[in-house]
UniProtKB/Swiss-Prot annotation:
Subunit: Homodimer.
Family assignment from sequence similarity: Belongs to the glutamyl-tRNA reductase family.
SUPFAM superfamilies: Glutamyl tRNA-reductase catalytic, N-terminal domain, Glutamyl tRNA-reductase dimerization domain, NAD(P)-binding Rossmann-fold domains
Record's protein name: Glutamyl-tRNA reductase
Keywords per UniProt: Chlorophyll biosynthesis, NADP, Oxidoreductase, Porphyrin biosynthesis
Function: Catalyzes the NADPH-dependent reduction of glutamyl-tRNA(Glu) to glutamate 1-semialdehyde (GSA).
Length: 453
């Protein structure tokens, strides 16, 4: 089974590259269909696919067809996002087989997050799986993989203290503001966005003393709901220039595909602040901008303006780096749980080696049973319906009893890594060459990533 992963994350690629390869919710259907549907007679790259795209990672999980190479996936990313492969290929990582399961389980557990142990990633993994399921690109392998990964995440959070005191990206952003500005009381804080990140930011701002919040979002109903919950002022998106002119701190986290704040927006806000000051000789006004979105909400050249301090998600490392040292013992326990879940998936995957041969064996047995039963019933034409049912039941029982030992033996052999050997023997004994060829195709292509390198 060609289980495959190609991706990049905050450890391999800066936000400038991650935002170029990010998949929006509107992108996902077409991207998943391109990965799993034939194109001009050519087979698709994958029989199953899930795309996990968050502010810190872009990953494609799939069951690859024979002939699919890592270069094919690089080409897909380049073509879909209209970016030259040379601009990002050096940031990609590739995994196969059990390593894919290990990576996803650790990811769902928060072990590969910028903010160690953060809980949001588990919901993001689930959302990615459900989105692919709605498109129809999830089959039995990725279904099993993602369910086991979600269990890994849940177990790590329940069986360790990794989530105790763990920050979120939002909390880290607020902590960054507190470190830069000190007391947040009396500061004008503008939150842009109406999703989970903004809500968590509002919670943490209030917990850190902020008492003057304004929320702006394209969907005014979501902004109004957040404002009501946290005692904030709500403004329509069209009032963003006005909100910027009042703000000391801006925390932005929308899902916009391009920036919503450009240099001229902040320049105008600073000019307005300066005009409103009674003191002509005062220092120029300052603004702290924290961009938690990927793709970024705030244009990078905004940071060139005097008095402006712009931070992205990649700048949060200084706030959260200490958590790795503080939780090293907990990480060891979490990794043990991850390994247990990986073994469970690997055991299940090995049993799948037996399925093509077992399916063909039962189909062949059923063909023989039907042929012989039809021949016998033609000769016993005086039987009543009840007698015919008895004979048919007898034939089924004989077949099931005969097939039970080899079926059990092959499943057990597969669970212990001997499935290929036993399946080959069984296929030869029962003349099931077609099943053997099918299995070989499903198990082949071991050079999937080697060809890339």
């Amino acid at each position: 089974m060609n289980l495959f992963l190609a991706g990049l994350d905050h450890t391999t690629a800066p936000v400038e590259i991650r935002e170029q390869l990010a998949f929006s919710q509107t992108d996902l259907p077409s991207a998943l269909l391109q990965l799993t549907q034939a194109d001009n007679g050519s087979p698709p790259l994958f029989t199953e696919a899930v795309i996990l795209s968050t502010c810190n990672r872009v990953e494609i999980y799939g069951v690859a067809n024979p002939g699919t190479t890592a270069q094919h996936v690089v080409d897909f990313l380049a073509n879909f996002h209209r970016r030259p492969a040379g601009s990002f290929v050096h940031t990609l990582y590739f995994y196969q087989g059990e390593a894919v399961a290990r990576h996803l389980c650790a990811t769902a557990a928060g072990l590969r997050s910028l903010v160690l142990g953060e809980a949001q990633i588990q919901g993001q993994v689930r959302s990615a799986y459900e989105a692919a399921q709605r498109i129809g690109s999830v089959g039995s392998v990725l279904h099993r993989l993602f369910q086991i990964a979600l269990v890994a995440g849940k177990r790590v959070r329940h069986e360790t203290t990794i989530g105790k005191g763990a920050a979120s990206v939002s909390q880290a952003g607020v902590e960054l503001a507190r470190r830069r500005l000190g007391d947040l009381r009396g500061r004008e804080v503008l939150l842009i966005g109406g999703g989970e990140v903004s809500e968590l930011a509002a919670q943490n701002l209030i917990a850190n003393g902020a008492d003057r919040l304004t929320i702006v979002n394209r969907t005014s109903s979501r902004a109004a709901a957040l404002a009501e919950r946290y005692g904030a002022e709500m403004l329509d998106f069209g009032a963003l220039p006005e909100a910027l002119a009042r703000a000391d701190i801006v925390i932005s986290s929308t899902a916009a595909p391009v920036p919503i704040i450009y240099r001229h927006h902040i320049a105008e806000a600073l000019s307005h602040k300066q005009r409103m000051r009674a003191c002509g000789d005062c220092d120029p006004p300052a603004m702290l901008l924290i961009d938690l979105a990927v793709p970024r909400d705030i244009a990078a050249d905004v940071a060139e303006l005097p008095g402006v301090y712009l931070f992205t998600v990649d700048d949060l490392r200084e706030v959260v780096s200490h958590t790795i040292e503080l939780r090293s013992a907990v990480i060891d326990i979490a990794n043990q749980i991850v390994e247990e879940q990986v073994r469970e998936f690997s055991d299940w995957l090995r049993t799948q080696e037996a399925l093509p041969v077992l399916t063909m064996l039962r189909q062949r047995a059923e063909e023989v049973r039907n042929e012989e039963l039809t021949r016998a019933l033609r000769r016993l034409h005086d039987l009543s319906p009840e007698q015919r049912a008895v004979i048919e039941g007898l034939s089924r029982s004989i077949v099931n009893k005969l097939l039970h030992p080899p079926t059990r033996c092959l499943r057990e052999a597969a669970a212990h890594g001997q499935g290929k050997r036993y399946a080959t023997m069984l296929a030869e004994l029962f003349n099931l060459e077609h099943a053997l060829e099918h299995k070989a195709g499903a198990m082949g292509n071991t050079e999937l990533t080697d060809r890339m390198r």
